[in-house]
Amino acid sequence: MSVLAVIPARYGSTRFPGKPLAMIAGQMMIERVWRIAAAVPGVDRVVVATDDQRIMDAVAAAGGEAVMTDPDCRNGTERALDAVKRLNSDADIVINVQGDAPLIPPWVIGGVAETLRADPSLQMATPAIALPPETEARMRADKANGSASGTTVVFNKAMDAMYFSKNVIPFRRKPDEGAPTYQHIGLYGYRRDTLEGLVALEPTPFELTESLEQLRALENGIPIRVVLTDYRGRSAWSVDAPEDAVRVEGIIAAEGELV
């Protein structure tokens, strides 16, 4: 059962143009993500899906593989499928790895791939981590101040997602009691045909309300298996703006390289 990891990397960004090429501790961000994905056991091929020749050239110079995709792709999911088609890939499983996540541990990617490989009945999988109480409290405070950063997920006993939200869910009637809060990690694994079917569907009401692509799957009855993981003491941080790249450099200096 072959696994293809696709890293969508768009050059244009309102807050950080050219973000994939940003240098972080001596390596371009997109190179870092590519190297992490390439280090995952069981991933057979890693490809950067881009819309810009500068990213194509940079990935090739770093020893990676990239494919040019349609500049009109509306999101990373569409770009991932476009890459699969342009590569004429026969991969059974496609892993969509965020190009702005240079601190994603390889074992998190591997856990999603292995979950799909182990159970052929699963259509999609995505990781989540349990939040410590202090992190949850900080997230709730940030949300109260209008932050849209961070997504949480609730799931059933079978570990299938019931809902994803930019709000912190579940609501706590008693602050110190009840189930943990789980933060969603924006990485997805799909069966090839599930990815094709998902992209063909129209955007759905909750997807548009929350601005969360994965809700399109849930609203159309496509189950998403939640894979619980952890960062093993390492920090998580994505890059949305130049100051985030500086923060990531500091984390790497303190914690060392992932690969």
UniProtKB/Swiss-Prot annotation:
A Pfam entry, by short name: CTP_transf_3
Gene Ontology CC entries for this record: cytosol
Chief location bin: cytoplasm
GO molecular-function term, one example from the UniProt record: 3-deoxy-manno-octulosonate cytidylyltransferase activity
Swiss-Prot/TrEMBL catalytic activity: 3-deoxy-alpha-D-manno-oct-2-ulosonate + CTP = CMP-3-deoxy-beta-D-manno-octulosonate + diphosphate
Subcellular location: Cytoplasm
Protein name as annotated: 3-deoxy-manno-octulosonate cytidylyltransferase
Species this protein is from: Maricaulis maris (strain MCS10) (Caulobacter maris)
